[in-house]
Amino acid sequence: MGTNGGRPTKLSLVPLPKGSVLLPGATLRIPVSNRPDLANLLSSLLDRTNAIRRDANSITFGCVPLCSPYLSKDGQHVIDNGTVDEDKKEEFESLEAGQARKEDLYRYGTLGKVIGVQRRAYSEPHLLVQGVQRLTVRRVLRERPFFEAECILHDEKETPLNDRETAELFQQLRQLSRELLTLLRYTSLIPNTGGPRLSPLIARKFELIITKSDLAQAGRLADVMADIAESGLEDKLRVLAAFDVKTRLERVVDILNKQNQIIRGSVKFTTISTDNIPPASVLDISQIDPRIRDLLSRRGIPGASGTPPPGLGGRNNEADEKESNELDELQQRLKDAQLSPEAQKVADKEMRRLRKMMPVNQEYGVIRTYLENLADIPWTKVTEDKLGPETLKAARKQLDDDHYGLEKIKKRLLEYLAVLRLKQSTNQGLEQQISILTKELDNSGGDIEKDIPSLPESDRAAIESKLNALTSKRTVDKSPILLLVGPPGTGKTSLARSVATALGRKFHRISLGGVRDEAEIRGHRRTYVAAMPGVIVNGLKKVGVANPVFLLDEIDKIGGPNFQGDPSAAMLEVLDPEQNHTFVDHYINIPIDLSKVLFIATANSLDTIPAPLLDRMETIQLSGYTTVEKRHIAKRHLLPKQIRANGLSDGQVVLSDDVIDKTTTSYTRESGVRNLERELGSICRYKAVQFADATDSAKLESYNPVVTVDDLEEILGIERFDEEIAEKHGRPGVVTGLVAYSTGGQGSILFIEVADMPGSGRVQLTGKLGDVLKESVEVALTWVKAHSFELGLTSDPNEDIMKNRSLHVHCPSGAIPKDGPSAGLAHTIGLISLFSGKAVPPKLAMTGEVSLRGRVMPVGGIKEKLIGALRAGVTTVLLPHQNRKDVKDVPEEVSNGLEIIYVKHIWEAIRHIWPDAHWPGQHHMDFVESRL
């Protein structure tokens, strides 16, 4: 049927497939299969048509889309406030065009003209329909066997040529249309983009439509572009309902904007553009298949080779303008960073290269990343050290609050602070004098207007000489490089953080454990793909200042020489105070000043640290915590921390010193306090359960916060380590020695038992003894055999005390390995006690190495041994005379609770052990020597 420009007309209607919309000027393929209504409609239309005019082009009917539940009743507005009925959603999802009812039809449609039938191989036939003009469905007359309705056909309204807003919308539509076509063409060249594609022939056809369209045809162009763009059903229905040209232009412009943004989001774009690409659209040519790109380049397509097209200059669109602004920002960042002269020279050179380079160039990203790294390095920015009269006092308090003991490291750090403060005071005085002399030198030329005469040349030279002398006296702060060596869990890492807090500086931790590649320290050279600076430069970038505190954790576990280089050798320059002011990272390749960085390294052992690296660091030994120190640490730090961590409050868990000591000695054996903290956590959790039960049962008064020693077995289980206790009665051949555990921090007593039996002089050693300990038994036996006559053990100087006798030396706790020379004195006294039949006092313990001449030589672990002796009930201790200095480190309560006797020779020890006994050779003590 024909059009009537607004008068009601009876039309046959075809419901379009779900999601399809036919716009005027567009073409739509309607599947014929499973559409009985369409077959009945075509049959009826053909019967009505005269035989002479019977062809496909004469068949017209109304094409009405299915209505979306997301549109308002008038079809003009999208419902996006969440009020859409769920039943309507489900009904729409399951709706098919062949079973549509009149309620399912949209209010507006398009008069369609059949232009042909299409059928491809192995596919169902389709009816090709072209949109002619818009229509409004006024009233449905019947639904079966096909729809018929009373409709109003609408002619295209004239575009207001003098409306400025409409003209601007039309220009925007043309620009966005060109952009969409260009993006579709280029995305067709890129594999696996998943986006819409457009053949060159069809794209060329649409380009001609865009070019030839003028303002009078704005509505027609809007319909064409709305059909091309991939948009939602609701958007296209709103375009169909837009009879006003201006409204239609606004809606189509929104659709094109969304479509272009979606394509840009799926493909990486750069500043490459061509004459056919509008300024807002750019594409990364490198994404196109190389063979296609080469073909495009040979055919002369601009921009396909990766270079900007002639006349564009690469700086004529929004992306380029944004890129230019970013480069200006980078230039400002480099300026604000106050680079060193050498770094500034390199940065200026690279920035000039960058500005001349297209972003598509592979070097562009490399250079830009390099410059960004240069800008991030703190070349001159430092944390101001606020060193005043209260600095040392505040730093000492900070260190004491965070850590108990560790006096050596605290002393060294306070020394560094004091030196830093004195240097700062000296420099301030020099700066004042330099300022005065500089001012005098500036005024030495005189002032004619003020009638000030100039200084003689000799006076000027004197001022310059004095100024140079003062300048040379400026002190430069070179931070020390400290190495904290000690067992695990002794607070080395946390101490470094506490140092940073005390100094008021930023802190950064670098874990060197397991580092095998030299490039991790010094960075990769820029020639490598994805090269970046090493951990030192990255640390500076992270803290943002040139004088932080760097913790080099586990430096003893850094890798040695391998095919990737030597990481430990790379640390030589970093940790050398004479070289690290010109440290060169392979990536930056410019000297960086590390002299202001306070390096604190930690290690568990010195054995694996290369000698050249160890020589560059100031080593501070940290021994394990003693039981007394662990008690203080537990009371001040660990217990309050665990109480809070387990949801309790202060006072809800109370542990006495005896409970803490029992937990330390019977449930842990370590140098640090990590396991002690775990055990205290178990106690707190046990009390937390009791407190929760009391609270839930409203019997809070029954809760007892005190933990006793008897409760520990129920809370922590059976004791894991047995503590040796001094015996009450002495017996010949049994001596109490002293031992310091290899884990560090703890000591105890060790019984040495010697027994004899008939035999051939053989000596049997048991108790899992090490080689050094076995040798000390041999030395002790040799000395006793050599001096048996002086000791009154034999009646004849030539008699062998071991004749017809064998010995067995045993150290209890046979499962625990034992080694070291410190039991030499105890072995000697044990042999003398056995052979003489005199018992050693049970409350007396001893330690010391013995030489063949009978000298008692110094040993280690004195502090731990004395604490263990006091805890075991020992009252008197024999120590080597040369260990007198080590007793100064012993806590006062320990030294006051023990009688410490220093001996130089075995004869001295014998005299103190058995003061009432008479030894035949005692008068020879000062000059007796070996008979060997």
Curated annotation (Swiss-Prot):
Which cellular compartments is it found in?
Peroxisome matrix
The residues covered by the Lon proteolytic domain are 729-916
Motif Microbody targeting signal in this chain: 930-932
Q: Which residues form the Lon N-terminal domain?
A: 11-260
User: Which residue ranges have biased composition labelled Basic and acidic residues?
Assistant: 317-328
Q: Name one GO cellular component term.
A: peroxisomal matrix
Q: Catalysed reaction per UniProt?
A: Hydrolysis of proteins in presence of ATP
Q: Which InterPro entries match?
A: AAA+_ATPase, ATPase_AAA_core, Lon_bac/euk-typ, Lon_lid, Lon_proteolytic, Lon_Prtase, Lon_prtase_N, Lon_prtase_N_sf
Q: Where is this region: Disordered?
A: 298-328
Annotated catalytic residues = 822, 865
MF terms from GO for this chain are: ATP binding; ATP hydrolysis activity; ATP-dependent peptidase activity; serine-type endopeptidase activity
Q: List the HAMAP family.
A: lonp2_euk
Q: What function is annotated for this protein?
A: ATP-dependent serine protease that mediates the selective degradation of misfolded and unassembled polypeptides in the peroxisomal matrix. Necessary for type 2 peroxisome targeting signal (PTS2)-containing protein processing and facilitates peroxisome matrix protein import.
Protein name, per record: Lon protease homolog 2, peroxisomal
Q: What is the lineage of its organism?
A: Eukaryota, Fungi, Dikarya, Ascomycota, Pezizomycotina
